[in-house]
From Swiss-Prot:
Catalytic reactions of this protein: Endonucleolytic cleavage of DNA to give specific double-stranded fragments with terminal 5'-phosphates
Superkingdom of this protein's organism: Bacteria
InterPro entries on file: Restrct_endonuc-II-like, Restrct_endonuc_II_DpnII, Restrct_endonuc_II_DpnII-like
EC number: 3.1.21.4
Coiled-coil boundaries: none
Assigned protein family: Belongs to the DpnII type II restriction endonuclease family.
Disulfide bonds: none
Pfam families for this protein: DpnII
This protein's name: Type II restriction enzyme MboI
Biological process (GO), any one: DNA restriction-modification system
Keywords: Endonuclease, Hydrolase, Nuclease, Restriction system
UniProt GO MF annotations: DNA binding; type II site-specific deoxyribonuclease activity
Length: 280
């Protein structure tokens, strides 16, 4: 039995995060490995009293070593960051890496020169590993949606529910009215009664995106549900929905199968009662 909307809203979870959400160490290690040779070359500068001469010497031997200096101030090369130079001109950061004198200006003006001389850093590979961990926190927002999919997948797995993930809508040729509304579904589950096409998402905070999603799925659901052998299922969660209560309530009223992580057990019970098909 479907929960009353207020009960559904109040059962929204505070988080969908697992411990692997906070830092993607595989990505961190990959990013560090890509520049590790240059970092070890730059290690030559650490602790040098005459840093200026050390830069000249290293630049003469390995000019490309300095091409990664931006990461030492937590800036990625692809960002093409700009700053004002000593003449007040707008320049890109990588323009400082075209000569030894410019590199010395960069080190002095960013404060890295003092850090290098004072031996505050022992090894630039370890230092950049820490920077990469910090920068990776910016990707957490993107991992939120993936984490919801993982949470749903875990519940399906624990219940021994067979599913397919990220299924293109083109395999459902008999759903003529779908068009390009949903290019692929997060999960598809078949039972002896019907095929369930499932979308999942999670919102920690509010914004116009929530209203757009609720409106879109309210439109999509009847296009799919008009075919008796199919049913659209929306699994969503997060405290952000409390800022878009009205639009969610409208969707909850019009879409027969809307669940969150708390109520999903009801859908799983329904699937088991219908008999999940595994050989498709």
């Amino acid at each position: 039995m479907k929960l009353a909307f207020d009960d559904f809203l109040n059962s929204m979870s505070e988080t969908n995060t697992t411990l692997d959400y906070f830092t993607d160490f595989d990505k961190v290690k990959k990013n560090v490995a890509q520049i590790e040779i240059h970092l070890n070359q730059l290690n030559y500068l650490l602790g040098k009293d005459d840093l200026k001469q050390a830069v000249y010497d290293l630049y003469a031997e390995c000019p490309n070593a300095f091409s990664i200096l931006e990461i030492l101030i937590a800036v990625r090369k692809k960002e093409q960051k700009k700053s004002l130079d000593e003449k007040g001109q707008v320049v890109t950061l990588n323009s400082y890496f075209q000569s030894a004198d410019k590199i010395i200006d960069f080190l002095n003006n960013t404060g890295l020169a003092d850090v290098f001389r004072d031996k505050n850093i022992k090894n630039l590979v370890d230092y950049v590993f820490g920077i990469e961990v910090g920068l990776d926190t910016n990707a957490r927002k993107n991992r939120g949606g993936d984490n919801m999919s993982k949470a749903v997948q875990l519940l399906f797995d624990n219940a021994d529910i067979y599913y397919k993930k990220e299924v293109r809508n083109t395999i459902f040729t008999d759903i003529e009215s779908l068009g390009a509304d949903v290019k692929q579904f997060d999960f598809v589950i078949k039972t002896k009664r019907k095929t369930y096409v499932i979308e999942t998402n999670y919102y920690n905070s509010g914004g116009s995106k929530l209203n757009e999603v609720a409106r879109a799925y309210t439109d999509v659901a009847p296009k799919i549900n008009q075919y008796s052998q199919y049913e659209f299922v929306w699994i969503t969660d997060g405290q952000g929905w409390k800022t878009a209560k009205n639009k969610l309530q409208e969707a909850y009223t019009h879409i027969p199968s809307v669940y969150n992580l708390y109520t999903l057990h009801g859908f799983i019970e329904q699937l088991n009662s219908e008999g999940v098909i595994k050989d498709w």
